[in-house]
Amino acid sequence: MNKKVLTLSAVMASLLFGAHAHAADTRIGVTIYKYDDNFMSVVRKAIEKDGKSAPDVQLLMNDSQNDQSKQNDQIDVLLAKGVKALAINLVDPAAAGTVIEKARGQNVPVVFFNKEPSRKALDSYDKAYYVGTDSKESGVIQGDLIAKHWQANQGWDLNKDGKIQYVLLKGEPGHPDAEARTTYVVKELNDKGIQTEQLALDTAMWDTAQAKDKMDAWLSGPNANKIEVVIANNDAMAMGAVEALKAHNKSSIPVFGVDALPEALALVKSGAMAGTVLNDANNQAKATFDLAKNLAEGKGAADGTSWKIENKIVRVPYVGVDKDNLSEFTQK
């Protein structure tokens, strides 16, 4: 009897091991530049959710802790573990070439996401793709949103000069999103015939605490009573600005962000933020996962999906969000 039980246990263990080994056949290595980035945290959780819906796929997740050398080491380990594809959120976009050479050495496809590699890097490897957004579009849509509200709220023009006096919280200098959003939000306002005057601009590195400190300094400076609009390259910094404005009893000054994080949508609902721009984390995650899974299985990158690939890139569109359409995004 005991021998039969042992034999049955061995068979069950073998079956379980076989199932595990089968799942491991479609291993995908994923790196996130840092887990505690507000937006990338949403993307990461969405990728993990997509992974759970595909039982034949095993995701090997890594926090690169904002350290490119650490990410390079993680990629070496993932390749040594035999992953069939890589999904890489670069710490430094300039490191794409290094990552590609590692992947090429093992003939492993790589899907970059959120931080865009150079055209040269993408073109250097036939199995390299990118999922992200059009950085310019986010700035244009944010500009449209500000213009809409500026024209509807004459009281925002504190000195009645017909010109927006603004401060701008910029993301990481050199980051394509930070540079494009900073340039195109102002350009779009000017293209719409709205004059602008920059009172202050500084980087807060996408970070809420740094943005609060920058905003606090501006609200304690000589231009404190001239600020009419606060523009932030992302919601995390917009939330820091909201905290500083509240501390200075200036919550009536409108704040605009980008990302449509749940916390920011709550602030739009309460009126603490005037608007944001949906940076579609769920669809960026889904496209990244779908492409990586297809490539890991030896299929065409977009096979069986609705994603449109142009020049090896999937662009996920942005959408402006304010109180007028907020309900469309808070019911998800």
Curated annotation (Swiss-Prot):
Q: Name one GO molecular function term.
A: carbohydrate binding
Detail which positions bind Ca(2+): D157, N159, D161, K163, Q165, E228
Q: Report one GO cellular component.
A: outer membrane-bounded periplasmic space
Give the residue range of the signal peptide: 1-23
UniProt-listed Pfam families: Peripla_BP_4
Listed A to Z, the keywords are: Calcium, Chemotaxis, Metal-binding, Periplasm, Signal, Sugar transport, Transport
Q: Which residues bind beta-D-galactose?
A: D37, N114, H175, D177, R181, N234, D259, N279
Q: Which CDD domains match?
A: PBP1_GGBP
Residues the record lists as binding beta-D-glucose: D37, N114, H175, D177, R181, N234, D259, N279
The family database entries (Gene3D superfamilies) matched by this protein are listed as: 3.40.50.2300
GO biological process terms on file = chemotaxis
Q: What is stated as this protein's family in its record? A: Belongs to the bacterial solute-binding protein 2 family.
Q: What does this protein do?
A: Part of the ABC transporter complex MglABC involved in galactose/methyl galactoside import. In addition, binds D-galactose and D-glucose and plays a role in the chemotaxis towards these two sugars by interacting with the Trg chemoreceptor.
What is the official name of this protein in its record?
D-galactose/methyl-galactoside binding periplasmic protein MglB
Q: What is the lineage of its organism?
A: Bacteria, Pseudomonadati, Pseudomonadota, Gammaproteobacteria, Enterobacterales
